[in-house]
Amino acid sequence: MVAAKKTKKSLESINSRLQLVMKSGKYVLGYKQSLKMIRQGKAKLVILANNCPALRKSEIEYYAMLAKTGVHHYSGNNIELGTACGKYYRVCTLSIIDPGDSDIIRSMPEQTGEK
């Protein structure tokens, strides 16, 4: 039970930070746009939904590794990630270019990791 509570707490903090990025920062949604930003070196952090197709996930992780960009595996699916972004559609891949007022990039390294 303690582990479930901890994951819920971290999920809420990620969601609140995401909302702040949506209001005050710069970001791109979607696989193609995210890949483009990673290749250009503009992406600071990439967030992937947990039901992102394996080939896409591995390709983004590979390009992010080359560009030394952080990759965060969001614990919810693409519908939940879209809702967390305040959108009414599914979001599988999200790249943060400028976090704005949010401290999402500083707070992610302890949660970021390969799965």
UniProtKB/Swiss-Prot annotation:
A Gene Ontology annotation in the biological process aspect, one of them, is: antimicrobial humoral immune response mediated by antimicrobial peptide
The protein's superkingdom reads: Eukaryota
Q: Which PROSITE patterns match?
A: RIBOSOMAL_L30E_1 (PS00709), RIBOSOMAL_L30E_2 (PS00993)
Q: Which GO terms describe its molecular function?
A: RNA binding; structural constituent of ribosome
Checking Pfam families in the record gives: Ribosomal_L7Ae (PF01248)
Q: Name one GO cellular component term.
A: postsynaptic density
Sorted alphabetically, which keywords does the UniProt record give? Acetylation, Cytoplasm, Isopeptide bond, Phosphoprotein, Ribonucleoprotein, Ribosomal protein, Ubl conjugation
Renumbered to this chain, where is the cross-link Glycyl lysine isopeptide (Lys-Gly) (interchain with G-Cter in SUMO2)? 26
Q: Where is the signal peptide?
A: none
Q: Which residues carry this modification: Phosphoserine?
A: 10, 16
Look up keyword Transcription regulation and say if it applies. Answer: no
Q: Which residues carry this modification: N6-acetyllysine?
A: 26
Q: How does it assemble?
A: Component of the large ribosomal subunit.
Return the similarity comment.
Answer: Belongs to the eukaryotic ribosomal protein eL30 family.
The protein here is known as: Large ribosomal subunit protein eL30
